[in-house]
Design a protein with these regions (language model features):
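Catalytic nucleophile-elbow at a beta strand-turn-alpha helix junction centered on a G-D-S/GDSL motif
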Residues: 40-58
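Conserved SGNH/GDSL esterase-like catalytic core that processes O-acyl groups on lipids
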Residues: 58-255, 259, 463-468
Length: 470
């Protein structure tokens, strides 16, 4: 019975993003990716969502065959070409392949990628294909070696999004924040997901020279249109730190958004800015009322009698309330759930860390309040400057309320972990999730600019999406 519970623990585990992502590189000439047919010179500003992170990592090419023995994945998939911005660029350029180094507008990261890309194991757990501070991640932290992480080191990217950056950091950050230090392993605290990601800055921006901000890089490209999607990490860093990180003031969020838009406008670019989803609806956050049913179901599946499983789950819920302040309005993260199940497997009391394992009711309420205020600030900045607003918040909220996206009902796609919208980290979208977001941007831009850019074929993307149920 214990073995069966352990087997489930592996299945339930999800992870922290590597604490070693970073940047660095040597200078290079500005080689601009040729457009195929489009006359639009589009640049992407943002964080990991615009960069195309999936399953804790950033990578520009597949790893084949899969180096993890017995993994159900025949290969480890590249992440960057599947991002929403890469798909948007492709649709603007007659379907050109954003993964082709000869023409790609992306700062393609060479395998095994930056971060710790998650891969399923034969036993049903998760592992990664790179160590947290292996040579690839370590190279990313030094300007002289950062471009060694790239497949296309001589190409100046048009997607200048830096994973982990906040709205304010896009205006001012010019260096990695910390040296490469070993983070938790593939099954660890989710606080590692966003705190080190901005250390990707040098591999992405090194072509522009030293001490360059993301905004400065975008302006240097002389865009006609710039997409801006920032603010997600302001929320994640607050929620996943147990509230220890001082939250960004909403007024500052609005001022920074306005500054970014106005500087891009002054450089001759139209701006398309997106607001933020309700962060706690991401699959990595399990609402407290769902904890008992999940644990009960998994323990029954592992072989425990139904009455014992239900009583055990009730005890877990009681401990969450009394010890951690996680009541009906709180959340347990996927990493926290993994720890709970691991403790149950060896008949021990579980211990959770405030940074990354759970979100108490009070912190959840504060996070949602900030979420609302940030969206109001971003919306006001767009209105004051005439920027086009992509209402990602409304799209996701409506889809969650509807039970998901009707791509292949009932299998895909919902917003729960493993439901098809998210990749294995429960924070960054799957191929299908990114494709739906690309279409939201395309449709908004077509309406705003009276253009006819075709939508991405989401059904075709879904058909080969390794992260979506079939």
């Amino acid at each position: 019975m214990i073995k069966r519970v352990r087997a489930f623990t592996a299945l339930a585990a999800v992870v922290s993003l590597a604490a070693c992502s970073g940047g660095g590189s040597s200078g290079s000439s500005h080689v601009l990716p040729p457009t195929v047919q489009s006359t639009v010179r589009i640049v992407g500003m943002g964080d990991s969502l615009t960069a195309g992170v999936q399953s804790q990592g950033l990578m520009g090419a597949n790893v084949a065959p899969n180096p993890i023995p017995g993994s159900p994945y025949p290969y480890v998939q590249a992440t960057q070409p599947h991002g929403f911005w890469a798909l948007l660029w492709s649709q603007l350029n007659a379907g050109a392949d954003p993964g082709n180094p000869a023409i790609s507008p992306l700062p393609l990261i060479a395998p095994p990628g930056i971060g710790q890309i998650l891969v399923p194991t034969a036993a049903g757990g998760l592992t990664s294909i790179t160590t947290s501070c292996g040579s690839q991640n370590a190279n990313a932290f030094t300007f002289s070696t950062a471009l060694n992480t790239r497949i296309n080191p001589g190409t100046t990217p048009f997607d200048v999004a830096v994973p982990g950056q906040t709205m304010h950091e896009a205006l001012f950050q010019i260096q990695p924040t910390t040296p490469c230090t070993a983070p938790p392993g593939p099954i660890g605290a989710l606080s590692g997901v966003v705190f080190p990601e901005s250390d990707n800055i040098l591999p992405i921006l090194a072509n522009f020279g030293q001490n360059v901000t993301q905004l400065q890089a975008a302006i240097a490209l002389k865009p006609t249109i710039t997409t801006v999607w920032l603010g997600w990490n302001d929320l994640l860093k607050f929620a996943l730190s147990g509230g220890a990180v001082v939250p960004t003031d909403p007024a500052s969020m609005g001022a920074d958004a306005t500054s970014i838009i106005r500087q891009l406008n002054a450089a001759g670019s139209k701006v398309v800015i997106a607001n933020l989803v309700d962060v706690l609806t991401a699959a990595t956050f399990l609402p407290q009322p769902a904890v008992a049913p999940v644990i009960t179901g998994r323990l029954i599946k592992a072989g425990l009698p139904a009455a014992v499983a239900a009583a055990t789950a009730a005890g877990v819920v009681s401990a969450l309330q009394t010890t951690y302040g996680v009541g009906p309005g709180g959340y347990v993260t996927i990493s926290g759930l993994s720890k709970i199940l691991g403790a149950l497997a060896v008949r021990q009391q579980f211990t959770l860390a405030p940074a990354g394992d759970y979100v108490p009711d009070a912190l959840a309420a504060n996070t949602q309040s900030l979420n609302n205020a940030y969206n109001a600030a971003i919306g006001a900045a767009a209105q004051a400057t005439g920027a086009t607003l992509v209402d990602v918040h409304a799209f996701v909220a409506t889809s969650v309320a509807a039970g998901g996206l009707p791509i292949n009902p009932p299998k895909c796609c919902n917003f729960q972990y493993g439901g098809g919208f998210y990749s294995l980290d429960g924070i960054h979208p799957s191929n299908t999730g990114y494709a739906t977001l690309a279409n939201l941007f395309i449709d908004t831009m077509n309406k705003a600019f009276n253009t006819t850019t075709p939508d991405v074929n989401v059904a075709a993307i879904y058909a080969t999406d390794i992260y979506a149920p079939h």
